[in-house]
Curated annotation (Swiss-Prot):
The keyword Disulfide bond does not apply. The gene is atpC. Its main location: membrane. This is ATP synthase epsilon chain. One of its GO terms (cellular component) is plasma membrane. It comes from Shewanella sp. (strain ANA-3). The lineage of its organism: Bacteria, Pseudomonadati, Pseudomonadota, Gammaproteobacteria, Alteromonadales. One of its GO terms (molecular function) is ATP binding. SUPFAM superfamilies: Epsilon subunit of F1F0-ATP synthase C-terminal domain, Epsilon subunit of F1F0-ATP synthase N-terminal domain.
Amino acid sequence: MAAMTVQLDIVSAESSIFSGRVASLQVTGSEGELGIMHGHAPLLSYIKPGMARIVKQDGSEEVFYLSGGLLEVQPSSVSVLADVVMRAKDIDEQAALEAKRRAEAHMATAGADFNYDAAMVELAKAMAQLRVVETIKKNIAR
């Protein structure tokens, strides 16, 4: 019996990052964590900055960082349209730590013209990248 899979396309503003059949996709939507598999009901959701984990047809996993975007689920396909997509192995941990430090420092020394929402978005993106790095480290340690 053939495995139940769905066509997944992950696309950034710059290029197509992944296209293929997958057993499942896990991503953080605007209302929380989503697990998408073959036969999922149609859905349209904003994506929060965070991790996308896919399980391929052969059972192997791949992890991506998404800075935000849109998820569309149709009966036979799933599309992720993301602002920025990075494979977990390509994330620069030191750069993410520095971005987190800068965002926290900026928030701590905020002036009258401070844009709190923009600072929170930058902090959330840096923290999401670091969570992806930590997840990969934990999986490697197993």
